[in-house]
């Protein structure tokens, strides 16, 4: 089974998370996508909502989307949500499956600042979402890693038959439709009494309004 993993604060979860995940699922023929809320994001400030509230919103979204499931493995943890620890744990639970960890190009460019980043490739492939026509500068230090671990590059240089069994360690660049949406933008709109109906799934907006979340 080919399993995509998209982590995030999801404070709140919105179409800027959901639409790229759907596009990646189709592009790479993934069997399912795990949406994984962080508990204590190491690279971010503490979230505005409780972990339980964010889990509820993500679970609601998953109930509306085919092939999407909530993964609460990080939410249950009392330590920072380091990706390598999570992927190692998921791989031990599903050793026979291929894991595809989804990230944006901005995160990929900061990958060397991540805790034990080299070990990510021991447990999963990386999916790097990029805007149409975007090209990483050839001199950028991450370009060598992107080239060496690119799925297309390895297919060409190692041969398709040899490479098909490889279930971690590759990078899959995927061009996605740009989504000019941020959780900060949504929280600001809600705090002003505006209704960002075009940015959130209806089930998410209903929960936020019913619980009176993000109000000043």
UniProtKB/Swiss-Prot annotation:
Keywords for this protein: ATP-binding, NAD, Nucleotide-binding, Nucleotidyltransferase, Pyridine nucleotide biosynthesis, Transferase
Protein's UniProt keywords contain Glycoprotein: no
Source organism, top-level taxon: Bacteria
Pathway: Cofactor biosynthesis; NAD(+) biosynthesis; deamido-NAD(+) from nicotinate D-ribonucleotide: step 1/1
Annotated HAMAP family: NaMN_adenylyltr (MF_00244)
Family to which this protein belongs: Belongs to the NadD family.
Protein name, as recorded: Probable nicotinate-nucleotide adenylyltransferase
Encoding gene per record: nadD
